[in-house]
């Protein structure tokens, strides 16, 4: 099913296409997930890519997975968290590595801020893009190091939120 973005979502998507990082601020209910999905669809048209989608809770990671897979197919999916899912799931670094190296398709990894460090501890994983949902959680002391480590190994990183924590040094894509 094709996604029809609203004007503010189109503006955010165009800004993302021009920059490899940014904070996308859209009000609650404004369609942040559809912006992520459309960006990922375009990115996954090319050569082999690994996408990481980070959420604050397992339930939200599972919901994002359902939303993404409603619009994106022909990808391998891994969940890196301790919750139940219908997809391959693990929190063991060696199993994450094995899954990553054994895949012959584009990959999408759904995880939580709590389990993100398991991905950054997997040395062979090269991440093409990371989408952090409810990104204000990424600033918490408990998750900051894992998020920082992930930003070092991924080509593109986007932080989606309706409630930003703003620093004067951040690059913002504000809708």
Task: Give the label of every model feature segment.
Residues 1-25:
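Conserved pre-motif I regulatory segment
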Residues 16, 35-43, 64, 146:
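Hydrophobic residues on the short alpha-helix immediately C-terminal to a glycine-rich phosphate/catalytic loop
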Residues 20-39:
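Walker A/P-loop
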Residues 27-29, 136-137, 151-170:
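Conserved helicase ATPase motor motifs in RecA-like P-loop NTPase domains
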Residues 49-68:
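Conserved Walker A/P-loop ATP-binding site and its immediately adjacent core
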Residues 75-118:
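Inter-Walker segment of RecA-like/P-loop motor cores
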Residues 122-158:
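SF2 helicase catalytic motif II
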Residues 173-175:
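Conserved small/polar residues in nucleotide/adenosyl-binding loops
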């Amino acid at each position: 099913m094709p996604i029809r973005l609203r004007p503010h979502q189109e503006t955010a998507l165009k800004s993302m296409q021009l920059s490899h990082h940014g904070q996308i601020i859209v009000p609650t209910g404004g369609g942040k997930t559809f912006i992520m999905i459309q960006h990922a669809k375009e990115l996954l048209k090319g050569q082999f890519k690994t996408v990481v989608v980070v959420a604050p809770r397992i339930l939200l990671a599972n919901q994002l997975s359902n939303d993404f897979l409603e619009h994106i197919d022909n990808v391998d999916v891994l969940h890196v968290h301790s919750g139940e899912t219908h997809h391959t799931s693990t929190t063991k670094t060696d199993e994450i590595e094995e899954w990553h190296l054994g895949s012959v398709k584009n990959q999408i990894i759904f995880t939580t801020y709590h389990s993100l460090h398991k991905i950054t501890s997997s040395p062979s994983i090269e991440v093409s893009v990371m989408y952090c949902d409810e990104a204000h959680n990424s600033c918490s002391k408990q998750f900051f190091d894992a998020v920082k480590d992930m930003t070092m190994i991924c080509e593109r990183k986007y932080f989606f939120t309706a409630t930003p924590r703003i620093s004067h040094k951040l690059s913002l894509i504000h809708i």
